[in-house]
Swiss-Prot record:
<keyword id="KW-0808">Transferase</keyword>
<protein>
    <recommendedName>
        <fullName>8-amino-7-oxononanoate synthase</fullName>
        <ecNumber>2.3.1.47</ecNumber>
    </recommendedName>
</protein>
<comment type="pathway">
    <text>Cofactor biosynthesis; biotin biosynthesis.</text>
</comment>
<dbReference type="InterPro" id="IPR015422">
    <property type="entry name" value="PyrdxlP-dep_Trfase_small"/>
</dbReference>
<dbReference type="InterPro" id="IPR050087">
    <property type="entry name" value="AON_synthase_class-II"/>
</dbReference>
<keyword id="KW-0012">Acyltransferase</keyword>
<dbReference type="GO" id="GO:0008710">
    <property type="term" value="F:8-amino-7-oxononanoate synthase activity"/>
</dbReference>
<dbReference type="Pfam" id="PF00155">
    <property type="entry name" value="Aminotran_1_2"/>
</dbReference>
<feature type="binding site">
    <location>
        <position position="139"/>
    </location>
    <ligand>
        <name>substrate</name>
    </ligand>
</feature>
<feature type="binding site">
    <location>
        <begin position="212"/>
        <end position="215"/>
    </location>
    <ligand>
        <name>pyridoxal 5'-phosphate</name>
    </ligand>
</feature>
<keyword id="KW-0663">Pyridoxal phosphate</keyword>
<dbReference type="InterPro" id="IPR004839">
    <property type="entry name" value="Aminotransferase_I/II_large"/>
</dbReference>
<feature type="binding site">
    <location>
        <begin position="243"/>
        <end position="246"/>
    </location>
    <ligand>
        <name>pyridoxal 5'-phosphate</name>
    </ligand>
</feature>
<feature type="modified residue" description="N6-(pyridoxal phosphate)lysine">
    <location>
        <position position="246"/>
    </location>
</feature>
<dbReference type="InterPro" id="IPR015421">
    <property type="entry name" value="PyrdxlP-dep_Trfase_major"/>
</dbReference>
<comment type="function">
    <text>Catalyzes the decarboxylative condensation of pimeloyl-[acyl-carrier protein] and L-alanine to produce 8-amino-7-oxononanoate (AON), [acyl-carrier protein], and carbon dioxide.</text>
</comment>
<feature type="binding site">
    <location>
        <position position="187"/>
    </location>
    <ligand>
        <name>pyridoxal 5'-phosphate</name>
    </ligand>
</feature>
């Protein structure tokens, strides 16, 4: 069968299942609102958890610095090179130093994206003599990192730490190094990893623990350093991965680690070496947002309070709302049910996108409500009331 015919059939199959994706065009943002199709909707599908992307004072302060310029090239629009050539600007070092200091770590390393981090770190650190144990619901970028790495890998049942321990016990003495990889906040179910249990297992079996805090940074911990900070286990994490593209309202990612690991990754990590570095201007903005979020304890508390309120209200109304984080999934089952609810909410003034298989398991299509700290209690209550009326 010619490739064009195969693709056409696959597209028809996706359309028949209501799983055909397109790139929706969005317009201006105004606080928690987004313009879509000429209408201003309350945005419940963004990862800008703290609202930093539209904080006027922060943006004005940063823009004033941009207008003054910088002799060290910190506001250049492009790096035009890999970091190992001519793309390693001083502002990148400032950002990494600020991150390492905040975490009390020896070193930090900035990457172009969380995808670059997760597809590069494991293949660099592991060999064919190693084993990687990964939570089954880890992000696609982690899964791709597993596939690229030469090490063997197993995926333990989601949050089933008894299963993980069985795998650790059976691997004892058979590998040079065992790695445990988990997210802290799982983005589709909104649940949290038991990091204290994972630290205990890491210590007992001599494993290396890597935690992806993509959805935890900015939201958890007194200084927004993530769930590891909130649970007091930071010093027990071998590598912590964070992202600038969510609560920090920028682009790129970082990893916190020992100086030894950092030096090794600089020399071996293909997704760091063989790519053009981030523009210095974006590194400068990331430094501004990272510094600002360290002080946003009140916003974090408000955000988590909103999530608890919405989850309880919808749960009392008969909706299935698993998890316990600022990400509130509303599981509706069939694909068409999720698509219909999203369309009805759009008519009511809300931008809440459906998530369907294969992103989530079959018969668990859902709305993934991503809450923001700049939402008001009244807006959350109105959303819950609207969803109840649409269901009845």
């Amino acid at each position: 069968m010619p490739i064009e015919e195969h693709i056409a059939r696959e597209q028809e199959r996706l359309r028949a299942k209501q799983r055909y994706r397109t790139l929706p065009e969005t317009g201006a943002r105004r606080g928690p609102y987004i313009t879509v199709g000429g209408r201003e909707l309350l945005n419940l599908s963004s990862n800008d958890y703290l609202g930093l992307g539209s904080e006027p004072k922060l943006l004005a302060s940063w823009m004033a610095q941009v207008e003054c310029g910088g002799a060290d090239g910190r506001f250049a629009m492009t790096s035009s090179s890999s970091r190992l050539l001519t793309g390693n600007f001083p502002v990148g070092g400032e950002l990494e130093s600020a991150i390492a200091k905040a975490y009390g770590s020896e070193a930090a390393l900035v990457f172009n994206s969380g995808y670059h981090a997760n597809t590069g770190i494991l293949p660099s650190l592991s060999t064919r003599h190693d084993l990687i144990l990964s939570d089954r619901l880890n992000h696609a970028s982690i899964i791709d990192g597993l596939r690229i790495a030469e090490a063997e890998y197993r995926r333990y049942r989601h949050a089933d730490y008894d299963h993980l321990e069985e795998l650790l016990a059976s691997a004892a003495g058979k590998y040079r190094q065992v790695f445990i990889v988990t997210e802290s906040v799982f983005s589709m179910d909104g649940d949290l990893a038991d990091l204290r249990r994972l630290v205990d297992l890491k210590k007992r079996y001599g494993a290396m623990l890597i935690v992806d805090e993509a959805h935890g940074v900015g939201v958890y911990g007194q200084r927004g350093l993530g769930l590891c900070e909130a649970l007091g286990v930071l010093e027990n994490i071998d590598i912590l991965i964070g992202t600038f593209g969510k609560a920090l309202a920028s682009t790129g990612a970082y990893a916190v680690m020992s100086g030894l690991f950092r030096e090794y990754l600089v020399n071996t990590m293909r997704t760091l070496i063989f790519t053009t570095a981030l523009p210095p201007m974006m590194l400068s903005w990331s430094l501004a947002t990272f510094t600002r979020q360290l002080e946003m304890r009140r916003e974090r508390e408000h955000l988590l309070g909103l999530a608890a309120r919405l989850r309880e209200t919808l749960g009392d109304a008969g909706f299935e709302t698993p998890g316990e984080s600022h990400i509130v999934p509303v599981v509706l089952g069939e694909d068409r049910a999720a698509v219909a609810m999203a369309a009805a909410l759009r008519e009511a003034g809300y931008h809440a996108l459906p998530v369907r298989p294969p992103t989530v398991p079959e018969n668990s299509a859902r709305l993934r409500l991503s809450l923001r700290a700049d939402l008001a209690v009244e807006q959350i209550d109105a959303l819950a009331s609207t969803m109840q009326s649409l269901r009845s």
